[in-house]
Amino acid sequence: MLATRRLLSWSLPARVSVRFSGDTTAPKKTSFGSLKDEDRIFTNLYGRHDWRLKGALSRGDWYKTKEILLKGPDWILGEIKTSGLRGRGGAGFPTGLKWSFMNKPSDGRPKYLVVNADEGEPGTCKDREILRHDPHKLVEGCLVGGRAMGARAAYIYIRGEFYNEASNLQVAIREAYEAGLIGKNACGSGYDFDVFVVRGAGAYICGEETALIESIEGKQGKPRLKPPFPADVGVFGCPTTVANVETVAVSPTICRRGGTWFSGFGRERNSGTKLFNISGHVNHPCTVEEEMSVPLKELIEKHAGGVTGGWENLLAVIPGGSSTPLIPKSVCETVLMDFDALVQAQTGLGTAAVIVMDRSTDIVKAIARLIEFYKHESCGQCTPCREGVDWMNKVMARFVRGDARPAEIDSLWEISKQIEGHTICALGDGAAWPVQGLIRHFRPELEERMQRFAQQHQARQAAS
């Protein structure tokens, strides 16, 4: 969420070299997907079991947590780095590296972990399922992650609209306190750690890490200029790491089963399992945990029952939430669902929220609606975003009608490029990329619509 700009610098295709030698090591995997049930981390994703402490314990949560804590920060960070885990909130930054930024000599200030549960990206609902059905995984993850970075407390910033999810999370935290799992001498480890819940107020911009920090501090949710980065000056002026719900929730399982186990899924630099949301024109919309690098076509057909009307009825897919550029059917045939493959396809994994659009979709109107959302959610702090997104919104409204000239398509492209990379946070990028994807793959549709409007206008003038 609002973190996809950094994805580009961490998702360049890995350089491949081939050496002929007597090496007898096992060849690298070439097929991905079909995750086995015993390898799933989120075992109560659909709420079929008890989400409270008793049920969580029966599913393996809080197992040997004390031993993990006693092994110390360096061991935990080593396992996270070995796992190859990358941030699950959109940026894809290596988690072990990010968490290690907090392990500097103490200057007397406390350190904090902030969990970004402000899930507001259109099409994204993976974190909601964790909060609702597996809250103890997140609470335990806060403890393990906090230990790794020497934090004294975690603040879970949860989207204001998530009333039931916040209630379940509060119950899970209370149960953990009562059982001695968090708080003073957490799990009997001698480590003190508190967990607090902060409710948001429905602002999408607060999904950006520094705007989220501002909101926790009681200020307007507007992004800060960086540097200083949160690892130096974060919440209450103290060193802070902001992490996604899914990223934090998987850390205890990685420590229990080993970083090598986790890195065995997916391609190199794109390892592990991942929660995918599949919505739109599919027969069975769902949230599913699957192996990273699973083919997009397999993901849709196996878990979502396929595209309505069959695969040939597919028009386009937004692969990573509303802020990632769409890809047409021709790309969807072969693309893999991971960071590097989707960057090569000129889009991004983002939050892995797959939005499927069949041939009945008015693709121009769909993208125009997304731009209207970003225009509404812009905080107005940066001129390129405030003025540029408003301008794009007005132009896209005319493109929906066809009331424009083909040359304006190039103008819209140029404006989107002027917004991209010229704002404090990535909301401007998130607004620009859907437009760029539309122009890149559906320019003929735009031109045809404009031509049709011009012909109708001429016919009306001739009739009058």
From Swiss-Prot:
Record: residues binding FMN: 199-247
Membrane topology: Peripheral membrane protein
Role: Core subunit of the mitochondrial membrane respiratory chain NADH dehydrogenase (Complex I) which catalyzes electron transfer from NADH through the respiratory chain, using ubiquinone as an electron acceptor. Part of the peripheral arm of the enzyme, where the electrons from NADH are accepted by flavin mononucleotide (FMN) and then passed along a chain of iron-sulfur clusters by electron tunnelling to the final acceptor ubiquinone. Contains FMN, which is the initial electron acceptor as well as one iron-sulfur cluster.
Residue list for modification N6-succinyllysine: K81
Reaction(s) catalysed by this chain's protein: a ubiquinone + NADH + 5 H(+)(in) = a ubiquinol + NAD(+) + 4 H(+)(out)
Location in or out of the cell: Mitochondrion inner membrane
This protein's record includes keyword Cell inner membrane: no
Example of a GO MF term: 4 iron, 4 sulfur cluster binding
Keyword Phosphoprotein belongs to the record: no
Residues involved in [4Fe-4S] cluster binding: C379, C382, C385, C425
GO BP term, example: mitochondrial electron transport, NADH to ubiquinone
The organism's taxonomic lineage, starting at the top: Eukaryota, Metazoa, Chordata, Craniata, Vertebrata
Principal EC category: translocase
EC number: 7.1.1.2
Cofactor: binding comment: Binds 1 FMN.
Keyword terms: 4Fe-4S, Acetylation, Electron transport, Flavoprotein, FMN, Iron, Iron-sulfur, Membrane, Metal-binding, Methylation, Mitochondrion, Mitochondrion inner membrane, NAD, Oxidoreductase, Respiratory chain, Transit peptide, Translocase, Transport, Ubiquinone
Pfam families associated with the record: Complex1_51K, NADH_4Fe-4S, SLBB_2
Protein name from the UniProt record: NADH dehydrogenase [ubiquinone] flavoprotein 1, mitochondrial
